[in-house]
C-alpha cells in the first residue's frame, strides 16, 4: 500500500468538498455555499501549489480574465486564495460590502456591491470575488483533473 501524500490528501479534500449540496445548480442561498467555496479554494490552491512546485503547473487560460498578475488558472486561484482573509470580514446581510457572490447559468448584471458580472454558460456555476470570476466545472474541476492526470500518470 502506498503512503498517502500531501497531494492525495488535497485531492480527497477537494472531492469531498465538491460533493457538497452547495455546488449544485439549484442550491438555495440559504446553504452554506460561501464557507464551502472558501474550503474549496483553500484545497484547490494547495493542490495547484504542489503541482507547480513539482514542475506541473496548471496553466490553461480559457475563461480566465488575464490581466495584471492573473495570467492563468493557477494565478487566478492564488489571487482568490489571497483574498480569503479579507472576505472573513464580510457580514451576512451587508449586501453592499459583500465581495463574494455566485451566479448559476448564463446571465449578466450587477451584484449588490456594484460589481458587474457576466456568466457565459448554462448549467454552470460562476463564483466571483469582486470582479474576478471562476467557473466550477470549466475551470476548477478542469484544474483538478489536470493535476490528477499529471500525478497518476507518474505512478
Residues of each region from the PLM?
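Short, hydrophobic, well-ordered secondary-structure elements
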Residues: 32-54, 78, 82-85
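Acidic, Ser/Thr/Gly/Pro-rich intrinsically disordered interaction regions
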Residues: 1-34, 60-155
Amino acid at each position: 500500500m502506498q503512503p498517502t501524500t500531501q497531494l492525495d490528501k488535497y485531492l480527497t479534500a477537494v472531492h469531498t468538498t465538491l460533493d457538497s449540496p452547495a455546488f449544485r445548480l439549484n442550491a438555495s442561498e440559504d446553504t452554506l455555499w460561501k464557507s464551502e467555496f472558501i474550503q474549496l479554494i483553500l484545497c484547490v490552491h494547495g493542490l495547484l501549489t504542489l503541482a507547480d512546485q513539482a514542475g506541473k503547473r496548471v496553466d490553461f487560460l480559457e475563461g480566465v480574465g488575464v490581466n495584471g498578475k492573473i495570467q492563468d488558472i493557477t494565478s487566478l486561484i492564488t489571487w482568490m486564495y489571497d483574498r480569503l482573509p479579507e472576505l472573513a470580514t464580510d457580514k451576512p446581510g451587508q449586501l453592499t460590502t459583500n465581495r463574494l457572490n455566485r451566479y448559476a447559468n448564463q446571465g449578466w448584471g450587477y451584484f449588490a456591491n456594484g460589481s458587474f458580472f457576466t456568466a457565459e454558460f448554462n448549467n454552470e456555476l460562476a463564483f466571483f470575488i469582486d470582479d474576478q470570476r471562476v467557473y466550477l466545472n470549466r475551470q476548477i474541476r478542469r484544474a483538478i483533473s489536470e493535476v490528477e492526470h499529471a500525478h497518476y500518470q507518474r505512478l
